[in-house]
Design a protein with these regions (language model features):
Chain C
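Short sequence/structural segments immediately N-terminal
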Residues: 4-5, 19-75, 88, 284, ...
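A detector of repeated loop/turn-to-beta-strand junctions in beta-rich toroidal repeat architectures
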Residues: 42, 88, 130, 172-174, ...
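Surface loop/turn motifs at the tips and blade-to-blade linkers of beta-strand repeat domains
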Residues: 62-65, 104-108, 146-150, 188-191, ...
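Short loop/turn segments that connect beta-strands within beta-propeller blades
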Residues: 95-99, 137-141, 179-183, 231-235, ...
């Protein structure tokens, strides 16, 4: 007892401090729990912690397919100051010697190192151009806008709306050309337009396995059309049989992913792309990959994906490009390369992740903004559309070049 | 020495008592928070919670908006500050609700303008009907963008609200939803919308707790509207009932506009339920209740939030007695702001405000206040609405706003029971956990 | 007694006959006056009851099967002339030495054009109403292959290396490109509206395609017609040249040096009140020119003269020396010869502003028109001999080929294609239809606004004295004999009335047709104008899934909510088969502020897909717009409950509706349904 007393006597201050700190920590925990995290400060592009948290890839086939991953740099940026009609660019499409950019204030065309803008006054359905594709057959440019679908053919604008045509809805998130057919993902269902027969198709919950008619992305490949249905996962349409099937999140819950790699990560899908027999699916909850047999999921905590919030994606051969709210990621099944902007010194960051190893390299040039909305590649060049300007990067033949 | 020991003992005792005094509430708080899963979900109601921990919980954190826009300089030549409104204004069975919603929003605008608008510039409401032909909601939001609104309020119908939200994201327009209780609306990670009305998840939990744990029913038949409100609304109820160990004995549907429900009621009778849950709009539900009683079904009836309506009482009359529903607020509370709103609204529009008017009023006030604080910049208005600080705990006429990480309102929800031809409101009782339930049932 | 009885019977009989005759005469006068809307018609029963017989023995007896030469090609050595006999579905081969028809090859329905390969051994013929090409071996004179095209294949051209074939799909407004090695269609390029002709530039770098109809334009604006330029290397459209205030660009030609590309065209003043006709200049006719220099400057020049118009320019050919152009004016039976050096000089000395002024100048043609050569009825296709010495002219309604010496500019020969020698009443009517002789100063013929007896897609200010009042969308004349009344407001109870007094008062502003001519014109309109097969949307009669769903929507009696649709607001009430018109007047809520009050004659829906724009004033650009823009109050059928995919289905069904002859069963079914309901 005496010892005890002595102990108390000696350590009374320490004990008091401990007790006080316990109290304070309890209080602070309770306060934090009640008010949640303040993201206002986080809004300013908080850097993602890159560490060795990445779990090893499990799918051996992915490794087998992986090829050498190119690294891009020498970023050149274009904004209103350079001739863009608006800084906010929704999409970009390389078309031979020119580059087409869909902005919030019209279509911008970069040719011979100058920008030219086309707006609703010229015949665009709406100045908000969300998606662009070019028909390989005819060279016609198809523009998905906030106010309808426009075909731009050798200078002539032809507009299809839900009022003058069979278009499902005027808000067109994605347009693609598939041979003579044009497919759209709209706010009122997916749609198809046969440029030969002029027949429109509308695909909604009334005739396809969707819960609701909201669609966000569409792509073609392997004799199929894949539709990113908002809340309905991925809808697959086989052209030959004209049959639909769907791929949904097996756990059926919006708030969780129960098991990794059990199917598409989430039913709210934002984009689809198909290349090399692989279907890639973007969500605001991560990335999914489907090889026709197995699904594999990628999240920011278990892979080199920089953010789960994926605005758009596009596969080019073995490489898939991911436009996220924290930069541009690219992935070939084995290696991740992410391009970010260093807010402190305006330089760029290249983050390379392979298995559990992550390396960050500083680059002298940077993408124009980390909120990336669109991407397109051709040969050794990549173009991206961002929340503030568009950027053009090129393959760094010598990785040290430009770094 | 003895004195010293006593002194020490006393000090320790005081300190211990003080510590215990402070620690108890903290531990109590922590204890409660430990139970709080996403959406106020108790442990036993967590999806797959009894069997498997989820690989990823998507709404543990907040989705930031990292895009550009905060740097945009506000215009200096404005003559009005436009705020959009999207609701069912004509051509829909929801039109009466949409009109109330519009009036609630307009009322807030009028009050704000009476106080000088935004730095002397009046606010202007830009109403848009979401029920136009051939899928209007998406186009209407585009029109709002062309009209240069700074934010908008909308809507009630699930489908239209979802569509509007998608466009709001693309156009980056802050959106406040005050009328669509679809739980999936805020489960999209779109950082451009907050909701200031409790959702069907909260309604479902309240009903499930009341029906199974308090009233001890075990065989529930559901008759719901064959629309998204009915389909999505019942989902959380169905799942929660299942997780409590009581799968629904029957779930059947009816179409909007139907007037004869004999077939469905016969099926319900055959399923021998000991209570019935109705999820749909007031008119059809009232007719169903009448026909149920007519066909000899005397089981207690529980229902969704839209049943708390004058129309239901008028059509169902005495048959509505005992009907228990949820409601996202209590319009009969003796809160000065609420009382004043009810009175002024009645004077202004010649009718009592309903749940949509009241939440629209609160929602519009959130937008107005956000504009006042953030200025005329959409991204900054968004930042404010979603920062979990500025409006966390906001006291509106509909109660306290508590936003979860997905910006869903998980504040309190009320329940009502029809007694003597009126809706009697009572607070939702705390959810009874498995442990408490087991204790109760063990002698 | 017996005699008296006989007398009584005879006189009684005579009295009854007289009475009957008087009554019959009275009825006949009333009937004829009602039908013709005049009171001095000679009461020739045959006018209506014989000449307008469409089938049966009488029809066979009074009508003939004509050839109607339309387009021509010459063998590379010039020894054989290949003639498209449009009405005989045949390719005629003429020996240019003897000027005799030496062979006839059966081709597909309504052939349009023929091209011959450089080796002279193979020909391709486009069958406009069969949507295909025939490949013909000219040695064996056999059809050796059939290539499926887009809709309404018209002109065909080879790429310079003859590896590819470009086909102008006139109905679907495209150009199909075929790989001749694989005989496959590799792509279709969007062309202008209703393109018909194409020609490669002399250097082979590009092809130009002319079109007849204006592009879809904002309501109430003048026509804008596209000339499409296709880059031969990429086989993509590289430019779309828009000729403003012009249309009906039927054909085009390059000068041998390529310095000029010239197309025929018409400049309509459709938005000017039609009273302008009696002041002239309502329709002017001429050429559109594109210079290879001057950044591709575009010019329009008239071939008309003050107080004399040369209507409906059709084909154009240019002499091998590049000095002269020859234009067939099918509305006035004239070949105009143009001095291209004068044109070059005019272009060289004129600013764009000056040239714009010339585009409306009736006197400028005196500078470059060097000769007007008369031809037989309705000259169409032209071809020059390889040495340029002879011009062959297809005289379509003469069944002959005129041969003109290009040095003397005189007709030196006429090749008889051995068609029927007799000119039937209907044939005479067709000549009248295609000729401008009855219009004040020959400004236009029926054909001008009704090319192919169909419609030109323009909206006219009919008879109104004020700008923009009473605008009327041109209506088709195909198969209209059995569906009176006529005009949008249904004021004309018969074609006699439509094309009689009213015609001269409002449209031609000259003396009206005499009764023989009127009989002939009516006979042609009633018997000679058929709907093309609807190969595009309903080739076999088997409806697509969407069309079947749309048919249900068309015949529905209840809304999506289960509410009964009032009979007068159901589609099939006003649009019952076989013509899909009940021939009654109705108010569908589409009267505009600029219209005088009127009800609308329910229009027929056969082949409705090729009649854009829609509504009486052409305000609906597409079928969809009928319901998305002009039916707010469900007056034009209850449609506002429909989902978009249902509307699409309905439109697909409407586009599938073809000629009335296919809907006899539907009539019975429809009547049975109605009876059942009643």
């Amino acid at each position: 007892m005496k010892n005890n007393n002595r102990f108390f006597q000696k350590n009374i201050k320490v004990l008091s401090l401990i007790l006080l700190s316990v109290f304070l920590s309890g209080f602070s925990i309770s306060k934090q729990d009640k008010s949640f995290q303040n993201d206002l400060e986080d809004n300013q592009a908080k850097p993602v912690e890159i560490s060795s948290r990445v779990s090893p890839e499990t799918g051996s086939d992915i490794k087998d397919e992986a090829q050498q991953m190119p690294v891009y740099g020498n970023w050149e940026t274009f904004t209103v100051k350079d001739g863009l009609p608006a800084d906010k660019a929704y999409c970009v499409r390389i078309d031979g010697d020119r580059v087409l950019v869909g902005t919030s204030a019209g279509l911008a065309v970069y040719e011979n190192e100058t920008w030219k803008t086309y707006t609703a006054e010229d015949g665009l359905a709406h100045n908000g151009v969300l998606s662009i594709d070019v028909s390989e057959l005819t060279g016609d440019v198809w523009l998905g806008t906030l106010g309808g679908l426009t075909r731009w053919s050798a200078g002539r604008f032809e507009t299809f709306t839900q009022f003058n045509s069979g278009l499902a809805n005027d808000v067109i998130y994605t347009v693609i050309c598939d041979g003579k057919d044009v497919w759209v993902a709209t706010g009122g269902g997916a749609g198809s337009y046969d440029t030969y027969t002029r027949e429109w198709g509308i695909y909604t919950e009334r005739n396809a396995p969707m819960h609701e008619p909201w669609t966000y992305g569409v792509c073609a490949g392997g004799g199929k059309i894949f539709i990113a249905a908002w809340g309905g996962g991925v809808i697959e349409y086989t052209k030959e049989t004209k049959q639909f099937r769907d791929y949904v999140d097996p756990d059926g819950e919006m708030e969780i992913d129960l098991f990794p790699d059990d199917g598409v990560i989430h039913d709210i899908t934002t984009g689809v792309t198909f290349a090399d027999d692989i279907l890639w699916v973007a969500t605001y909850f991560g990335l999914s990959r489907y090889d026709g047999t197995r699904w594999k999921g990628y999240l920011d905590h278990d892979s080199g994906l920089v953010s789960n919030f994926i605005n758009f994606l596009k596969a080019d051969g073995p490489v898939v490009w991911l436009c996220t709210d924290l930069g541009l990621s690219s992935f070939n099944g084995e290696t991740w390369v992410t391009y970010r902007k260093n807010e402190n010194n305006k330089k760029g960051k290249i983050i390379i992740t392979e298995g559990e190893n992550t390396k960050e390299i500083s680059s002298t040039t940077s993408i124009s903004h980390e909120f990336v909305i669109g991407v397109d590649t051709q040969d050794d060049v990549v173009w991206i559309a961002t929340s503030k300007g568009v950027s053009r990067g090129e393959i760094l033949k010598d990785l040290t070049a430009g770094l | 020495m003895k004195n010293q020991d006593q002194k020490i003992k006393l000090r320790v005792l005081v300190l211990t008592i003080l510590t215990m005094f402070f620690l108890f509430p903290v531990s109590d708080l922590n204890g409660q928070d430990k139970k709080l899963n996403y959406g106020n979900t108790t442990d036993e109601l967590v999806p797959y919670g009894r069997f498997q921990k989820a690989y990823k919980n998507f709404f543990d954190d907040v989705q930031p908006f990292t895009g550009a826009g905060r740097e945009k300089v506000p215009p200096t030549d404005l003559t009005e500050v436009r705020i959009g409104f999207l609701g069912p204004l004509e051509g829909s069975i929801l039109t009466p609700l949409g009109i109330q919603m519009l009036q609630g929003a307009s009322f807030a605008i009028e009050e704000a303008n009476n106080k000088g608008g935004y730095n002397g510039i009046p606010f202007k409401l830009m109403p848009h009907n979401d029920v136009g032909l051939w899928g209007a909601a998406a186009n209407e939001v585009v029109k709002m963008n062309d009209e240069k609104v700074w934010a908008f309020l909308g809507s009630i119908d699930d489908i239209n609200t979802h569509v509007a939200l998608r466009v709001a994201l693309k156009l980056e327009i802050p959106m406040v939803n005050s009328g669509d209780p679809d739980p999936t609306l805020t489960e999209t990670r779109i950082p451009w919308m907050i909701r200031n009305i409790a959702d069907d998840r909260q309604s479902s939990y309240a009903l499930v707790n009341h029906i199974y744990r308090e009233k001890k029913h075990s065989r529930i038949a559901v008759l719901r509207a064959n629309n998204r409100y009915g389909r999505v609304g019942i989902m959380e109820f169905r799942d929660a009932a299942l997780r409590y160990g009581f799968p629904l004995v029957l779930e059947i549907r009816y179409n909007d506009g139907e007037i004869d429900f004999a077939t469905q009621i016969e099926r319900m009778i055959k399923s021998s339920p000991d209570a019935v849950v109705l999820w749909g709009n007031a008119k059809e539900t009232a007719l169903i209740i009448n026909q149920m009683r007519q066909m000899g079904m005397e089981q207690p009836v529980y229902g969704s939030d839209r049943l708390m309506s004058k129309e239901l009482l008028e059509i169902a009359g005495e048959n509505a007695e005992g009907l228990v529903t949820t409601c996202q607020y209590n319009p009969t509370l003796d809160e000065p702001n609420l009382v004043a709103f009810n009175k002024n609204y009645n004077e202004r529009y010649g009718m009592e405000p309903d749940v949509f008017a009241a939440h629209a009023y609160d929602g519009m006030n959130l937008i107005i206040e956000a504009i006042h604080k953030a200025g005329l910049n959409r991204a900054l208005i968004r930042d404010l609405l979603t920062d979990h600080k500025t409006f966390q705990g906001y006291q509106g006429i509909t109660g306290e706003l508590i936003l979860d990480p997905s910006w869903n309102d998980i504040g309190s929800i009320w329940m009502t029971e029809v007694r003597d031809g009126k809706f009697d409101f009572f607070p939702t009782p705390p959810l009874i956990s498995d442990e408490q339930e087991n204790k109760k049932s063990t002698p | 007694m017996k005699r008296n009885k006989k007398i009584f019977l005879v006189f009684g009989g005579l009295a009854i006959i007289s009475l009957f005759f008087i009554q019959f005469h009275k009825w006949s006068v009333h009937h004829v006056n009602y039908i013709t809307a005049v009171d001095d018609h000679p009461l020739n029963c045959m006018s209506c009851h014989l000449y307008i017989q469409k089938d049966g023995i009488a029809a066979k007896l009074i009508n003939e099967d004509y050839l109607s030469p339309y387009n021509l090609s010459l063998a590379p050595d010039g020894k054989k002339l290949y003639v498209i006999a449009q009405d005989a579905n045949a390719l005629l081969i003429v020996d240019t030495k003897t000027n005799k028809v030496i062979d006839k090859i059966e081709v597909g329905e309504k052939p349009h054009s023929v091209v011959i390969k450089n080796d002279g051994e193979t020909a391709f013929v486009s069958n406009q109403w069969a949507d295909n090409l025939y490949e013909i071996d000219l040695t064996s004179l056999k059809v050796i292959d059939t290539l499926k095209t887009g809709s309404g294949p018209a002109e065909i051209i080879f790429s310079p290396d003859e590896k590819f074939l470009y086909v102008v799909d006139s109905y679907s407004s495209e150009v199909s490109i075929f790989n001749l090695q694989t005989k496959t269609e590799i792509k279709r390029l969007m062309a202008g509206n209703n393109p018909v002709a194409a020609v490669f530039s002399p250097d082979g770098s590009q092809a130009i395609v002319t079109s007849r109809r204006t592009l879809p334009i904002p309501y109430g604006t003048p026509p804008m017609t596209e000339l499409t330029v296709i880059d031969a290397a990429s086989q993509r459209v590289k430019e779309r040249k828009i000729f403003e205030n012009a249309y009906l660009m039927e054909n085009a030609a390059f000068t041998p040096s390529g310095d000029l590309a010239i197309s025929t065209l018409i400049r309509p003043k459709n938005l000017i009140p039609s009273v302008q006709v009696e002041r002239g200049w309502m329709m002017t006719h001429g050429i559109g020119i594109i210079e290879s220099g001057n950044e591709g400057r575009m010019i329009q020049l008239l071939t008309d003269e003050p107080n004399s118009y040369y209507s409906d320019p059709f084909d154009i050919v240019i002499s091998p020396d590049g000095q002269k152009a020859f234009i067939s004016h099918s509305g006035v039976d004239i070949i105009t010869v143009i001095d291209l050096n004068e044109i070059r000089a005019l272009l060289a000395e004129s600013t764009q502003e000056k040239l714009d002024y010339y585009s409306n100048h009736l006197g400028i043609s005196a500078r470059y028109v060097i000769k007007r050569i008369p031809t037989g009825a309705n000259p169409k296709g032209l071809v020059l001999s390889p040495d340029g010495k002879y011009l062959y002219v297809a005289e379509r309604l003469e069944d002959k080929i005129a041969v003109i010496n290009t040095e003397t500019l005189e007709t030196i020969n006429s090749i008889d294609l051995n068609g029927p020698s007799r000119i039937t009443v209907a044939r005479q009517g067709r000549r009248l239809f295609n000729n401008s002789g009855h219009t004040f100063q020959n400004q236009y013929g029926c054909y001008t606004c009704h090319p192919d007896s169909h419609e030109d897609g323009l909206v006219y200010n009919m008879a109104g004295a004020d700008m923009g009042r009473n605008l009327a969308n041109t209506q088709t004349l195909r198969d209209i004999g059995d569906i009176p009344p006529y005009k949008w407001n249904g004021k004309n109870s018969s074609i006699y009335k439509q094309d009689g007094m009213r015609f001269s008062t409002i449209l031609t502003r000259t003396e009206s047709f005499n009764y023989d001519d009127l009989d002939a014109l009516v006979a042609y309109i009633v018997t000679g104008i058929k709907n093309p097969p609807n190969l595009r949307y309903n080739p076999t009669g088997e409806l697509t899934a969407a069309q079947k769903r749309g048919k249900k929507v068309f015949y529905r009696t209840h809304t999506n909510c289960g509410k009964e649709i009032p009979v007068e607001n159901q589609c099939a009430t006003c649009h019952p088969p076989p013509y899909f018109t009940n021939m009654q007047m109705a108010d569908v809520g589409t009267l505009s502020d600029t219209d005088d009050p009127m009800l609308f004659d329910a229009p027929q829906l056969n082949n409705i897909y090729e009649s854009a724009p829609y509504l009486h004033d052409g305000s609906a650009a597409t079928l969809e717009e009928l319901w998305t823009k002009f039916n707010d109050d469900d007056e034009h059928g209850v449609a506002n409950d429909m989902l978009k995919d249902q509307l699409n289905d309905l439109v697909e069904y409407l586009k599938s509706i073809r000629d009335a002859k296919y809907y006899k069963d539907d009539v019975e079914e429809y009547k049975a349904d109605i009876n059942q309901e009643n």
